[in-house]
Amino acid sequence: MTIRIAINGFGRIGRNVLRALYESGRRAEIKVVAINEPADAAGMAHLLKYDSTHGRFDWDVRQERDVLYVGDDAIRLLHQKEISQLPWGDLGVDIVLDCSGVYGKRADGEMHLASGAKKVLFSHPGSSDLDATVIYGVNHQQLQSEHRIVSSGSCTTNCIIPIIKLLDDAFSIESGTVTTIHASMNDQQVIDAYHPDLRRTRAASQSIIPVDTKLAAGITRIFPKFCDRFEAISVRVPTINVTAIDLSVTVTNAVSVLDVNTMLQRAAKGDFRSIVDYTELPLVSIDFNHDPHSAIVDGTQTRVSGKHLIKTLVWCDNEWGFANRMLDTTLMMARIGF
């Protein structure tokens, strides 16, 4: 059975989801029937085809009025600003991938359902009353057919939570801290301009900029036992894609660098192979651009202090890896039934 999906919001994640669908060869399983985006149709087609981060999309893309063609596939373009006005029922939409970055409350998901969708998947952390938050590769097996309003978490939770799980299962984590070294985002300024967050009033290309993060809360949502045992900070750096996460954890079991790297390398070759990768090559951030894994461990940067303090450096393409996990989760939501 082919799943009929709609994408609500055709920004960075929405476009990457569509592109990842075509590049990953999953079109037999997922069909995009509609995209809702307030922007004009010509701009939507142009930005799908030509991307400053991921390069040209290697499919024929054209737009005729409010229809986007990718190859021979026709996708209806909508420009509604209110979820309640979206014709998901008329279009036979099974799952809405809400990539707007605006919506994330249960009431928002319920509006998608009222408009005729069978299920909703948010591309960002949602409110605590959603049916589930899924970090694919860690807890996706907990999805149930009655889970209709679901969140995919964030790019950073998808990156770090698999590593936390692996370290905890192997060495028993007691507590931890996380520093996210994140590429610039579109909520920052090109040149100095007003923003409610005074640090984000400053030009993104000129500074390393500390920003607030709810990553610690995201970790606790997946692993309640770590409540009050993880803290996180985040800085934005002047690159347009790929994020590094510095994870430090104290563990119960005595370990060495070799112990940690051997375990992570085995996981990357085993059950986590599509989620986690491992490298000891002397790479830099741009080398991980367009990498579909949620997390890539840089084994050259692993450190152990006093046998119980582990520091790891983990890379992720914060757009492409996350877009691929959204597709994985979409397929899982369909397989368990409507």
From Swiss-Prot:
Compartments where located: Cytoplasm
GO molecular function: erythrose-4-phosphate dehydrogenase activity; NAD binding
Feature type site, description Activates thiol group during catalysis: H182
Catalytic activity: D-erythrose 4-phosphate + NAD(+) + H2O = 4-phospho-D-erythronate + NADH + 2 H(+)
Binding positions for NAD(+) per the UniProt entry: R12, I13, N318
Pathway: Cofactor biosynthesis; pyridoxine 5'-phosphate biosynthesis; pyridoxine 5'-phosphate from D-erythrose 4-phosphate: step 1/5
GO CC field: cytoplasm
Binding residue positions for substrate: S154, C155, T156, R200, T213, K214, R236
InterPro entries tied to this protein: E4P_DH_bac, GlycerAld/Erythrose_P_DH, GlycerAld_3-P_DH_cat, GlycerAld_3-P_DH_NAD(P)-bd, NAD(P)-bd_dom_sf
Gene3D superfamilies given in the database record: Dihydrodipicolinate Reductase, domain 2, NAD(P)-binding Rossmann-like Domain
Key words, A-Z: Cytoplasm, NAD, Oxidoreductase, Pyridoxine biosynthesis
Record GO biological process: pyridoxal phosphate biosynthetic process; pyridoxine biosynthetic process
EC number of the protein: 1.2.1.72
Major location (coarse): cytoplasm
Domain of life: Bacteria
Active-site residues, record numbering mapped to chain: C155
Enzyme class: oxidoreductase
Quaternary structure and partners: Homotetramer.
Role noted for this protein: Catalyzes the NAD-dependent conversion of D-erythrose 4-phosphate to 4-phosphoerythronate.
PANTHER family xrefs: GLYCERALDEHYDE-3-PHOSPHATE DEHYDROGENASE 2 (PTHR43148)
Family: Belongs to the glyceraldehyde-3-phosphate dehydrogenase family. Epd subfamily.
Protein name from the UniProt record: D-erythrose-4-phosphate dehydrogenase
Gene designation per UniProt: epd
